[in-house]
Amino acid sequence: MKRSKNLSKKRKILISILSILIVSIISIGGYLFYVVNKSTETLYNKTYEPIESKKAEPEIIEATKPMNILLLGVDTGNEERPDKWEGNSDSMILVTINPKTKKTTLTSLERDIYMNFGDFNAKLNSAYARGQNKEAISTIEKLLNIKIDNYLMVNMEGLSDLVDKVGGIEVTNTFDFPISISDQETDNLNQIPPGTHKINGAQALVYSRMRYQDPEGDYGRQKRQREVITKIIQKVLSFDSLSHYQDIINSISNNMKTSIPLNINNSLALLGYKDSLNTITQEQLTGEDLMLNGISYQVVNGQHLLEIQNKIRKELELPELTELKTNAITVEALNTGIKNEEPDLENQPIQDNTPKPQKEIKQHENKQFNSELGYYE
């Protein structure tokens, strides 16, 4: 097996960009949603969807303790799907936000990670297709051995629409050739000439996706992605008209589902997480290539996974783990034939670092989690 080079597919890349951007907008949303509070009821009704199938009472965010948000990017490429939220979760990023250290950590999870689902094995991203956000969250909780506080789900339509809603952005093509992806997509003729130009949403997708012509490869592409995100945030913060914010809210509400109630009660609290974006670090759970029955998987190394688990736990201010517990099929498990011990997820009440509910949420009444030790026993 070879170590994966993390060659992200185009949908995963674009959804990742949109996911990070929406988290940024949420974190500065204390002001945005506050100044347009008349729109918050519509935004709440369109975007709020709790982790369980039936809605719980809205939660009040407290920006005093670390929290995490699972970002799910849904593949909406099949035009025959009647529901734009159907499909696999082709992008999965755990965002860990610590307002005390003013730090945000983005942990990307490979969609093809080889997982054990009890009676069968399959890819990580198939969990969403079987049980949508509830199944995806439960699966990733077992993978990382942590409690996930909230989720945020986006679809592919969002990034281009959002760039257009802010009136386009200005970027600089430092190459001596136009940035284009027409060699991969012959019907996509959008390009960005050398130099500084104002680009629209369709061009922003191209600018963020090009990799093969970049001498720095994926690293160069990531720099352009960060440039796009930064420019959009700068445009959002520069607006002095409520109509601009209204357009942005409409764009978000049409392309996002989240367990975080975006209402006026949470608006000022969300603002408390803004400074956590000052320092953003990125982690990647990678694997080794494995081909089984013509299907390609990524098999994670147990030590690498344990290191990722503990990096997340450090940002959540939880004790370090010395033993790996996971539902992933690791390299060691394949070599020895010994299945990994899974965390006990039958009981999982809200941890101290979750948003505080207005009243007891019944969906957790039969669940238990060792909040002192910070892991499942």
Question: Where are the regions that the model predicts?
Answer:
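Entry/capping segment at the start of metal-dependent catalytic domains
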Residues: 2-101, 287
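C-terminal solvent-exposed extensions
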Residues: 51-52, 56-57, 119, 257-377
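Flexible, polar/acidic helix-loop-strand segments at domain edges
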Residues: 60, 64, 164-243
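Extracytoplasmic
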Residues: 64-67, 87-92, 101-109, 119, ...
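Second-shell loop/turn segments in exported
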Residues: 79-83, 122-130, 145-150, 194, ...
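Soluble non-cytosolic domains of exported or imported proteins
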Residues: 85-89, 118, 127-134, 153-157, ...
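Extracytoplasmic/secreted envelope proteins and their assembly/folding machinery
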Residues: 91, 121, 125, 133-141, ...
